[in-house]
């Protein structure tokens, strides 16, 4: 695997149904391997865009597991170490994939994040990103990344303390608990994404992925109701730290455009 999915240690897989524009998550312990080998040398040929998309996906695995309603002391330990490794190395790794130390830290961080979300599940980011990828063929990690700023700010109202820690894992400018406010999150996340070449918003991400010419904002907006309905079918909605109805999901999509 790349330093992203953590699939080498999870019991989850995703199947894309192109006829229905739908991504289905499959869970089975039969998917767990007997042994997983992490070899950073295999990452050295990864394009920067792949390293960025997969790396931010790994960070979001840890972040969502950390704030999940199903979080536990065990998953917290895995998630915090994952965010430390991933947040501290993603810029360096994307800039130079041949940096073996950074690559190893990304791989181990991705693995810890995979263990964390196997126990604590994910949240609105992953529930909402799958429809974006299914309808518009946006890479999974990119779809997650463009949603994270608005969803993190939305969720932080329900769990201020944990998002304070998340902010310090991704931002080079650390703050004390008394200085932190949820409004700081979107800027810090977008700054990180900008540094590693991730698009800013759904419209830009969709157009970057499009193979058939420009896609208008209006075209994407027309799909929001259907995407929100699909997102609500995800079990991840139930463990998101802040309760969400379909109208909330539609609002978050619009904010993320």
Can you say where each PLM-predicted feature lies in the sequence?
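A glycine/threonine-rich phosphate-anchoring loop and its flanking beta-alpha core
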Residues: 1-73, 162-165, 169
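Hydrophobic "lid"/C-terminal helical patch
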Residues: 63, 90, 253-256
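Active-site segments that bind and position negatively charged phosphate/pyrophosphate groups
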Residues: 65-188
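C-terminal charged capping/lid subdomain of soluble metabolic enzymes
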Residues: 173-257
């Amino acid at each position: 695997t790349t330093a992203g999915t953590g699939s080498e240690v999870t019991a989850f897989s995703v199947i894309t149904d192109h006829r229905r524009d739908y991504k289905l998550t499959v869970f089975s312990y039969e998917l767990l391997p007997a042994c997983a080998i992490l070899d950073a040398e295999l990452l050295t040929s990864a394009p920067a865009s792949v390293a960025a998309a997969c790396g931010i996906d790994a960070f979001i695995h840890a972040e969502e597991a950390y704030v999940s309603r199903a979080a536990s002391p065990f998953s917290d330990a895995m998630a915090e170490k994952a965010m430390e490794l991933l947040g501290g190395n993603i810029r360096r790794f994307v800039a130079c994939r041949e940096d073996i130390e950074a690559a190893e830290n990304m791989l181990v961080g991705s693995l810890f994040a995979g263990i964390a979300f196997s126990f604590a599940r994910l949240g609105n980011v992953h529930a909402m990103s799958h429809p974006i990828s299914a309808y518009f063929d946006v890479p999974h990690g990119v779809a997650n990344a463009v949603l994270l700023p608005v969803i993190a700010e939305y969720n932080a109202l329900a769990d201020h303390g944990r998002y304070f820690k998340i902010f310090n894992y991704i931002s080079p400018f650390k703050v004390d608990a008394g200085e932190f406010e949820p409004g700081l999150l979107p800027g810090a996340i977008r700054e990180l994404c900008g540094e590693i070449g991730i698009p800013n918003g759904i419209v830009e991400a969709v157009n970057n992925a499009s193979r058939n010419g420009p896609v208008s904002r209006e075209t994407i907006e027309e799909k929001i109701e259907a995407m929100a309905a699909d997102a609500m079918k995800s079990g991840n909605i139930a463990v998101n730290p802040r309760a969400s109805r379909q109208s909330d999901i539609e609002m978050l999509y619009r904010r993320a455009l």
